[in-house]
């Protein structure tokens, strides 16, 4: 790929297979930077027969010549980061002088995680829980907005960090009544001890990453931006309130990494060939029959972070068109097309029809509030399947005609060229069109 700066973002509710494309391309880039999310997201990658599970670390970490960055839009649970680094080390991945963390990235503390679990459990009693991963991401971003959160750069001045963590700990415990006073003191002491040990392992990696990335770009080096979660989970534009607490869309890269908006970026959207979702929230094309069982089984649809079974359904092109409208993707990677090889017929949602009036929702629009999803029903186009193993095919022309037609229909509907097609679980199982 000749473009100097490339961005990859998911077009659904996450789990689109972004990690596979990032991993495939990042070996050709000098720097890979993650701009949002935390250890709530997850990539499961298969490279040369080895399975790698990543949560916080960018996918570029698997290639020895690639520098990796966690930007200021990422929230970092330090213990999880250290564990992830250690796990990769055991698999032969050396991140020495290859991982850098923004001084401005906010820290996720165990107390944030406790608050997250408490809120989910309380809401669950009233059937109002969001279905979060309970990783503390929401409470961390909440304290960030309240200006009581703590940036990782504060740990470079330990005395000041102790004061900030003490203040935050007692404030959160008081507001949420999570612990007694004695438990709070014990938690604070434990957190200080853990963070002193863990921070000593990555202190030299904490830098001004915004400056670093801009320098790479000015020097003409190739830079790759990796988004976490998916566009329909965006705090502002997703299926609110069943969303994450950060900006997951293409526009999030500018704040999440401190990038000049005049930088020319090739924007790549990753779209799974069918629809999945973890946790609660609207899902117009969700399946509950044998087709769900097939998608879930052959697609191995379990959350990498939580292990929860993913909800599955037919591809929702109404949602994808909505995402394309505010994202402006230049190219698309259609992932996991091979999973649909199990079906005699395949459906795609092309419109939402109002249940009372029969009126179709205008193309490019998407419901804003949860109650509106109940007012519409999906309109499907049925296409014939191909019932052929496509995992060994290397060119578009080798695909069965019905598979080609499926790809071309999506391409025409969205008005974006589908450049990559995922045909198997290995990183290299990918058709690249020209």
Swiss-Prot record:
Record EC number: 6.3.4.4
Reaction equations catalysed: IMP + L-aspartate + GTP = N(6)-(1,2-dicarboxyethyl)-AMP + GDP + phosphate + 2 H(+)
Binding site for GTP: 14-20, 42-44, 310, 336-338, 422-424
Nucleotide-binding is among the record's keywords: yes
Active site: 15 (proton acceptor), 43 (proton donor)
Entry-linked SMART domains: Adenylsucc_synt (SM00788)
Co-factor(s): Mg(2+)
Family that this chain belongs to: Belongs to the adenylosuccinate synthetase family.
Function noted in UniProt: Plays an important role in the salvage pathway for purine nucleotide biosynthesis. Catalyzes the first committed step in the biosynthesis of AMP from IMP.
Protein name: Adenylosuccinate synthetase
Originating organism: Theileria parva
């Amino acid at each position: 790929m000749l473009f100097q700066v490339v961005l990859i973002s998911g077009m659904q509710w996450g789990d689109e297979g972004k990690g596979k494309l990032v991993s495939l391309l990042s070996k050709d880039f000098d720097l890979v930077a993650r701009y949002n999310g935390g250890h709530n997201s997850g990539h499961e990658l298969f490279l040369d027969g080895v399975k790698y599970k990543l949560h916080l670390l960018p996918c570029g970490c698997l290639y020895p010549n690639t520098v990796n960055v966690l930007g200021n839009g990422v929230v970092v649970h330090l213990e999880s980061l250290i564990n992830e680094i250690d796990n990769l080390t055991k698999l032969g991945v050396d991140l020495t002088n290859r991982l850098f963390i923004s001084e401005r990235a906010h820290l996720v503390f165990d107390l944030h995680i406790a608050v997250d679990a408490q809120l989910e459990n309380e809401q669950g009693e009233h059937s109002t829980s969001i279905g979060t991963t309970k990783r503390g991401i929401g409470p961390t971003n909440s304290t960030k907005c309240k200006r009581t959160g703590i940036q990782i750069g504060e740990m470079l001045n330990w005395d000041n960090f102790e004061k900030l963590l003490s203040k935050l700990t007692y404030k959160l415990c008081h507001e949420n009544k999570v612990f007694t006073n004695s438990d709070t003191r014990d938690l604070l002491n434990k957190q200080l001890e853990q963070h002193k040990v863990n921070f000593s392992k990555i202190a030299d990696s904490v830098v001004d990453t915004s400056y670093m990335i801009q320098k790479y770009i000015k020097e003409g080096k190739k830079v790759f931006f990796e988004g976490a979660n998916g566009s329909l989970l965006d705090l502002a534009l997703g299926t609110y309130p069943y969303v994450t607490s950060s900006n997951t869309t293409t526009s999030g890269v500018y704040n999440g990494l401190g990038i000049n908006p005049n930088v020319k970026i090739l924007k790549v959207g990753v779209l799974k060939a069918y629809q999945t979702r973890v946790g609660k929230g609207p899902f117009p094309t969700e399946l509950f029959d044998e087709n769900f069982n097939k998608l879930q089984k052959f697609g191995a649809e379990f959350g990498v972070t939580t292990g929860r079974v993913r909800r599955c359904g037919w591809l929702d092109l109404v949602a994808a068109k909505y995402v394309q409208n505010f994202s402006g993707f230049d190219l698309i990677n259609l992932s996991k097309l091979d999973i649909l090889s199990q079906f005699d017929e395949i459906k795609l949602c092309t419109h939402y029809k109002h249940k009372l009036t029969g009126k179709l929702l205008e193309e490019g629009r998407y419901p804003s509030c949860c109650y509106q999803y109940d007012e519409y029903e999906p309109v499907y186009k049925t296409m014939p399947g191909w019932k052929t193993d496509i995992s060994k095919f290397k060119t578009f022309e080798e695909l069965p005609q019905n598979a080609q037609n499926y790809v071309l229909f999506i391409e025409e509907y969205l008005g974006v060229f589908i450049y990559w097609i995922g045909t198997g679980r290995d990183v290299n199982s990918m058709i690249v069109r020209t």
